[in-house]
């Protein structure tokens, strides 16, 4: 269609050109005639982001097919850094560039993503941008796949493709599990101070709306929908909680909308996506629900162990934003429950 429209325009233009040269007065309009301009057809190619009927599964970030990634969101540093700046420590490099160099997963909603124009980039990118603005700095993001087969810290994993190559000074989107030294130590990465918690939260609808805790679920023998192969499904197995598993959080939400289950435990980060993609759902997170200790984890960022000054810069910024409530406001704006860090 595009080429047809283009060819038609060219043919018309070429056919009119000689006439214009030979008899310009014949083509000109009289002073009394209204001047009407007809715009040329224009075709813009892109994703159809209009309303959709039914439920569309959340997008999966795939670099080989994602047009935004292929158009420039690559695994290389987004700004030029000189050899001299490369030899600086992270804090001096940040000041010299006027920019914080950060890495994050290209599709980890609601935390980070390769954002389109006028669309939110993710709550962690917003937090970083707020830190930068307070110090008259910019941010530049490098997108990296954090879900590599043997973990982000394994050989060939996300750290090897980003911070270990000196392409960024901080990695967003990390969860402190307490058993991840094998991911951090080989790359000499340490965590920043945690700035929030995530965890599995209780979601109910219909006849299950009176439930307020996992004890209620167990005592009343209500079947829970759970994501398969998750810490929550392991916990349910070990504690005799009746449940049915579904592959990934969004399929648990599907099961609730379809009436297969009326109660579920899903990761708190999935609440935001569920509200966007299943607006017809009647499910709600139990008001005031706090994840049980075994099913909640701190969120933090990763930095090189040697970057003591830069770590203090980030930690101090978190302290200030936690005290003012700014992080809580950002998180809740994304439709996700906010839980303060444990530490």
What are these regions (language model features)?
Residues 33-88, 126-134, 205-208, 215, ...:
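Extended ligand-binding regions for polar small-molecule ligands
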Residues 1-13:
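Bacterial N-terminal signal peptides that target proteins for export
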Residues 194-204, 268-319, 336-343:
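Periplasmic-binding protein-like
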Residues 107-109, 118-137, 199-252, 268-270:
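Bilobed "Venus flytrap"/periplasmic-binding protein-like clamshell domains
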Residues 101-106, 189-213, 301-304:
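Hydrophobic/proline-rich hinge and linker segments of small-molecule sensing/allosteric domains
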Residues 49, 53-71, 75-174:
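Extracytoplasmic small-molecule ligand-binding "clamshell" domains
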Residues 164, 172-185, 254-257, 261-295:
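A ligand-binding cleft/hinge motif common to bilobed small-molecule-binding domains
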Residues 22-28:
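Sec/Tat signal peptide C-region and signal peptidase I cleavage site
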């Amino acid at each position: 269609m595009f080429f047809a429209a283009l060819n038609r325009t060219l043919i018309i233009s070429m056919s009119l050109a000689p006439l214009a040269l030979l008899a310009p007065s014949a083509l000109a309009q009289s002073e009394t005639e209204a001047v009407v301009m007809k715009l040329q057809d224009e075709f813009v190619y892109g994703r159809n982001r209009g309303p959709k009927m039914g439920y569309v599964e959340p997008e999966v970030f795939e670099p080989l097919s994602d047009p935004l990634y292929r158009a420039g969101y690559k695994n290389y540093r987004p700004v030029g850094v000189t050899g001299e700046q490369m030899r600086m420590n992270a804090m001096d490099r940040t000041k010299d560039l006027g920019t914080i160099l950060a890495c994050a997963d290209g599709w980890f909603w609601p935390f980070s993503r390769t954002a389109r124009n006028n669309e939110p980039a993710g709550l962690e990118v917003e937090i970083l941008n707020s830190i930068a603005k307070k110090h008259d700095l910019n941010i530049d993001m490098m997108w990296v796949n954090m879900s590599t087969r043997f973990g982000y810290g394994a050989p060939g994993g996300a750290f090897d493709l980003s911070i270990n190559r000196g392409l960024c000074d901080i990695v967003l989107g990390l969860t402190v599990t307490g058993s991840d030294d094998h991911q951090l130590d080989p790359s000499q990465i340490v965590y920043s101070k945690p700035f929030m918690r995530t965890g599995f939260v209780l979601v109910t609808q219909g006849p299950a709306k009176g439930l307020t805790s996992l004890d209620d679920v167990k005592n009343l023998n209500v079947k829970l929908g759970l994501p398969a192969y998750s810490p929550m499904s392991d916990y349910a197995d070990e504690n005799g909680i009746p449940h049915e598993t579904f592959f990934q959080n969004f399929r648990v939400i599907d099961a609730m909308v379809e009436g297969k289950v009326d109660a579920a435990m899903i990761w708190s980060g999935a609440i935001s996506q569920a509200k966007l993609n299943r607006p017809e759902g009647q499910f709600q997170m139990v008001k005031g629900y706090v994840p049980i200790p075994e099913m909640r984890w701190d969120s933090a960022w990763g930095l090189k162990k040697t970057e003591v000054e830069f770590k203090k810069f980030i930690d101090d910024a978190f302290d200030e934003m936690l005290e003012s409530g700014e992080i809580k406001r950002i998180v809740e704006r994304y439709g996700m429950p906010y839980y303060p860090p444990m530490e």
